[in-house]
Regions:
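Membrane-proximal alpha-helical signals and transmembrane carboxylates
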Residues: 2-374
Length: 374
C-alpha cells in the first residue's frame, strides 16, 4: 500500500511539472519575436540596415493567431540592431529559428563582411545550416515582397535553396559551408543570388497588387568575403555539372529539324590529379523531358527510349564539355577555386605550400564527359 502511495505522489508531481513546463513554454513563446529571416544592407553612412521577418503569436490588441511581418532597424552592429528589434516590438528577438541570412547588394559589393559572417557562425542561437543568399538590390526590398508572393519570403527562399535546388541544377551553400570556403586554402566560394521579378497581375480582384516570382539562376563569387563577380547562366551550368549532389541539368539537342529536351537524372563526378594536371571526369545519365515546350507538338510523347539515336547523346556530351571548359577558363582567369581543387591537392600532398596557395593557372585540365540513357 505504501508503495502505491509513493507511485501516486510521483505521478502527481510529474503531472504538475508537465503543466508548469507547458505554461512556461507557452508564455516563453508568447513573449518572443521569432525571427525566421534576416536581411542586411549598408546605409549611406556605413551603418547596418537590418530587416527581420518575424513570426509572432498575436496577443492583446494584436490579431489572433500566428502571423509574420517585417521590421527594419539601423544599427552600428548586428547585435545592436537585434537589440533594437526587441525594443521596437516589445518582445525578445529570438534567432533560434532563423534559417535565412540575406545580404543586400549595397553591402556585399562594397565591403568586407567577414565580421558579420563570424558573428553568426559563433552565435549559439543561429543555425550553421541556415541558408545564406545575396539579393539583387536591397535585402530589405526582397523581404518585403511577401504580399506579392502571397507567402513568407524567408520560407519560400529556404524551401527552394535547401530542398528543391539539388533537383534543378542549382549548386547551393549553407552558411557554414560558405564560411569555411572563405577561411580555408584558396579562400574562394560562392553564394546564391535571389532576384524578385515582377509579372503581370492575374488577379482581377486586386488589379493594383504587385505580383512576381524569385529568380535563382545566378551565383555570386567571393574571395575572403570580398566581392569578385557574378556567374552567368553558362558558368552556373558548368559548376552544376561538376557538383555531384546536383541533378536536373538541361540540354537541348536537334534531330530532324526538331528541338528535343533532355534532363540529367543521375550523375557521377570524379576529380583526379596526376602531377599538376586535374582530370575532370563526368558521367551523366539523361532522360527525355516528360513534356517539351519547344514547338514539337507532342511528338516526344510517342518516342520510346529505344528510338533515340546515339547522335543525340553525342550532342549532349559536346555541350557539357563546352560548359565545363568555360568554367575552367573562368576559374583560371579570375584565380578562383569553386570546385575544391586546393582541398584535392592537400589530400594528396598534405599541407604543402603548393597545395595551400597555388594559382589556378599553375595547373592544367583534361575534361571527359560520358553520357548514357537514364
Amino acid at each position: 500500500m505504501g508503495s502505491l502511495k509513493r507511485i501516486g505522489i510521483v505521478l502527481v508531481v510529474a503531472t504538475l511539472l508537465l503543466v508548469m513546463s507547458a505554461s512556461f513554454m507557452s508564455n516563453d513563446i508568447l513573449n518572443r519575436a521569432i525571427i525566421i529571416g534576416l536581411g542586411l544592407d549598408l546605409a549611406w553612412d556605413n551603418q547596418l540596415v537590418v530587416t527581420a521577418e518575424v513570426v509572432s503569436p498575436g496577443n492583446g490588441s494584436e490579431q489572433v493567431g500566428t502571423f509574420s511581418k517585417t521590421i527594419t532597424v539601423t544599427g552600428q552592429t548586428v547585435a545592436q540592431a537585434i537589440g533594437l528589434i526587441t525594443q521596437k516590438m516589445g518582445k525578445e528577438a529570438s534567432l533560434g529559428q532563423c534559417a535565412l541570412l540575406m545580404l543586400g547588394q549595397s553591402l556585399y559589393t562594397k565591403v568586407d563582411f567577414s565580421q558579420i559572417v563570424d558573428f553568426f557562425i559563433h552565435s549559439y542561437n543561429f543555425k550553421e545550416s541556415s541558408v545564406i543568399c545575396c539579393a539583387k538590390g536591397e535585402a530589405k526590398d526582397l523581404l518585403n515582397q511577401g504580399e506579392a508572393m502571397s507567402q513568407s519570403v524567408s520560407l519560400a527562399i529556404i524551401s527552394t535553396l535547401q530542398q528543391q535546388a539539388k533537383n534543378i541544377a542549382l549548386p547551393t551553400n549553407s552558411l557554414l559551408q560558405y564560411a569555411r570556403s572563405q577561411k580555408e586554402l584558396s579562400g574562394t566560394g560562392y553564394i546564391n543570388r535571389v532576384q524578385f521579378v515582377s509579372s503581370d497581375n492575374a488577379d482581377p480582384q486586386n488589379p493594383n497588387k504587385t505580383q512576381g516570382y524569385f529568380a535563382y539562376n545566378r551565383l555570386v563569387v567571393f574571395c575572403k568575403n570580398k566581392f569578385v563577380d557574378v556567374l552567368d547562366d553558362e558558368l552556373v551550368a558548368g559548376l552544376s555539372l561538376l557538383t555531384q549532389k546536383v541533378t536536373g541539368d538541361v540540354f537541348i539537342v536537334q534531330a530532324g529539324g526538331e528541338k528535343i529536351t533532355f534532363i540529367t537524372g543521375e550523375k557521377k563526378v570524379d576529380i583526379g590529379i596526376v602531377d599538376t594536371q586535374v582530370q575532370l571526369n563526368v558521367q551523366l545519365k539523361c532522360r527525355l523531358a516528360r513534356t517539351d515546350d519547344f514547338g514539337t507538338n507532342g511528338s516526344l510523347t510517342v518516342q520510346t527510349e529505344e528510338d533515340l539515336p546515339p547522335e543525340l547523346f553525342e550532342q549532349i556530351k559536346i555541350q557539357a564539355e563546352e560548359l565545363v571548359q568555360k568554367l575552367v577558363n573562368y576559374q583560371q582567369m579570375h584565380n578562383v577555386d569553386l570546385i575544391g581543387l586546393h582541398e584535392k591537392f592537400r589530400q594528396r600532398d598534405g599541407s604543402t605550400q603548393f597545395a595551400n596557395s597555388f594559382a589556378m593557372g599553375d595547373v592544367t585540365f583534361s575534361i571527359q564527359v560520358k553520357v548514357k540513357q537514364n
